[in-house]
């Protein structure tokens, strides 16, 4: 193992132990940093002390030429900057060579959501098969509380307060949130808990795979996509789309941006504000369809 690999392994241990980042986030860091290790090795670097701003810029250009999108490149450079900042804090680098290198701005795409009618159709799973009950409970919790995928799979039974209809989740940066989940989610969690012991697990996880282990993020993605097809939805159903739908529907009903920010666990209001654009699109379509002066130029 080269010094390049050794330093990255040390950094990943730091993120896991000191920062307590989720396994999914750690895997993302690992993938991004493996790309720079490969590039550095190809260019004859033996240690990170040999890396300079020119090499980082060349790495960014190479990534773009290989088809990496602007948003993905920004993520890769962010991981690299964080890694170099850590090396500086360990007195192994004098300065961060990635500090002044930025990716081109990515066009901001509005997140797609599932409308209320399609959401009701998706949630209309009335099968008494244990795995179907588990899936219905996961869908209800994710849409009912606007959880991230990592937050959903990280739920333990001890995080539930079904009497008050609340759940505790550990979000980004180890920030805990206490969230209402709604009576439908409570009812389906209770139904799932009645069947959960069939899997004979001693795991504390709320949601289990058919092998009795904590369900994986990939398994959740696969099951949600399958239910989208079974329930006749035209659009691909993935977990983050349920979170988008929660945010959009909450804003359409309440208009309370700050409240939705708290529920989603966004550190910055600007992250939540993207959903106001979605809400405006909805209002604009209503206006165009209903207002007598809307049909301009016709």
Curated annotation (Swiss-Prot):
Pfam families hit by this protein: Phage_int_SAM_1 (PF02899), Phage_integrase (PF00589)
Superkingdom per UniProt: Bacteria
Transmembrane spans: none
Gene Ontology biological-process annotations: cell division; chromosome segregation; DNA recombination; DNA transposition; plasmid maintenance; plasmid recombination; resolution of DNA recombination intermediates
InterPro entries named in the record: CB (IPR044068), DNA_brk_join_enz (IPR011010), Integrase-like_cat_sf (IPR013762), Integrase_catalytic (IPR002104), Integrase_recombinase_N (IPR010998), Integrase_SAM-like_N (IPR004107), Recomb_XerC (IPR011931), Tyrosine_recombinase_XerC/XerD (IPR023009)
Location of the Tyr recombinase domain: 109-288
An annotated Gene Ontology molecular function: site-specific recombinase activity
Family: Belongs to the 'phage' integrase family. XerC subfamily.
Name of this chain's protein: Tyrosine recombinase XerC
High-level lineage: Bacteria, Pseudomonadati, Pseudomonadota, Gammaproteobacteria, Enterobacterales
The gene coding this protein: xerC
């Amino acid at each position: 193992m080269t010094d390049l690999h050794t330093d990255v392994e040390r950094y990943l241990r730091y993120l896991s132990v000191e920062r307590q980042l989720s396994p999914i986030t750690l895997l993302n860091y690992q993938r991004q940093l493996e790309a720079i290790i490969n590039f550095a090795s190809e260019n004859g670097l033996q240690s990170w002390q040999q890396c300079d701003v020119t090499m980082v810029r060349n790495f960014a250009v190479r990534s773009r030429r290989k088809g990496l999108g602007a948003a993905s490149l920004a993520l890769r450079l962010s991981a690299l900057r964080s890694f170099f900042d850590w090396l500086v804090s360990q007195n192994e680098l004098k300065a961060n060579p990635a500090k002044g290198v930025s990716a081109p701005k990515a066009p901001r795409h509005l997140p797609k959501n599932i409308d209320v009618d399609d959401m009701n159709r998706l949630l209309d799973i009335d099968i008494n098969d244990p795995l179907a009950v588990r899936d219905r409970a996961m869908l209800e919790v994710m849409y009912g509380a606007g959880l991230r995928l990592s937050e959903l799979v990280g739920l333990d039974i001890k995080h539930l307060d079904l009497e008050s209809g609340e759940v505790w989740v550990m979000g980004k940066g180890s920030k805990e949130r206490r969230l209402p989940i709604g009576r439908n989610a409570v009812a389906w969690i209770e139904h799932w808990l009645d069947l959960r012991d069939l899997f004979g697990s001693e795991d504390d996880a709320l949601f289990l795979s058919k092998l009795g282990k904590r369900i994986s993020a990939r398994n959740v993605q696969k099951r949600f996509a399958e239910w989208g097809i079974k329930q006749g939805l035209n659009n691909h159903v993935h977990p983050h789309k349920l979170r988008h739908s929660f945010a959009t529907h909450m804003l359409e009903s309440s208009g309370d941006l700050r409240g939705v920010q708290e529920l989603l666990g966004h550190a910055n209001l600007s992250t939540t504000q993207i959903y106001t654009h979605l809400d405006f699109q909805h209002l604009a379509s209503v206006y165009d369809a209903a207002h007598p002066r809307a049909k301009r130029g016709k």
